[in-house]
């Protein structure tokens, strides 16, 4: 999709940013889009995009930076984290005006992600218009101390069912893991 909002949720340390970078890598490899990221801090340097580090102490906020980057006519905007109402509203506006916006938010599951966005005064009608998908991640370790990711995912079709108050289908871990393998987040082990 060329425009809309894709959200990855989970707790601190669940790999949300790593997944966002893998998605950006895939977009860059397949489509060569103008990508701008807003991050606090920049976690992985990427040479194919403009990365802006957020520093609220210096007055460089997500909200102000989002307003400024629109002058660069980005195709894809990564907002490292939606933390407040202003950032949520501006990310929504960017998605509504033809940009692809990728972001993270702290929420325990996909449905709670929608509720968090609504608590930031994003209407369910606006979410219905722009949400492309929601993925929630939980990082776990097995008995050998190897990391694996548990994910749930709701695609756009099922999000529309949710907003129409119909039964929705979650993608189980195996489907989400296949997607993550394709974008380079999980190896073949």
What spans do the regions from the language model cover?
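Short, flexible helix-loop junctions that flank or precede catalytic/ligand sites
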Residues: 1-189
């Amino acid at each position: 999709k060329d425009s809309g909002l894709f959200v990855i949720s989970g707790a601190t340390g669940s790999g949300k940013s790593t997944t966002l970078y893998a998605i950006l890598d895939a977009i860059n490899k397949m489509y060569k889009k103008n990508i701008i990221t807003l991050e606090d801090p920049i976690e992985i340097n990427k040479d194919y995009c403009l990365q802006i580090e957020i520093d609220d102490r210096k007055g460089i906020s997500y909200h102000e930076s989002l307003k400024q980057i629109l002058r660069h006519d980005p195709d894809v905007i990564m907002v490292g984290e939606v933390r407040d109402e202003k950032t949520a509203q501006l990310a929504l506006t960017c998605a509504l005006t033809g940009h692809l916006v990728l972001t993270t938010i702290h929420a325990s599951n996909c449905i709670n992600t929608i509720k968090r966005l609504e608590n930031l005064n994003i209407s369910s009608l606006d979410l219905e218009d722009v949400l492309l998908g929601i993925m929630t991640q939980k990082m776990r370790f097995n008995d050998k101390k190897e990391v694996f990711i548990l994910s749930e995912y709701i695609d756009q079709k099922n999000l529309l069912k949710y907003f129409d108050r119909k039964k929705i289908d979650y993608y189980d871990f195996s489907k989400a893991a296949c997607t993550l393998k394709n974008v380079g987040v999980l190896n073949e082990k």
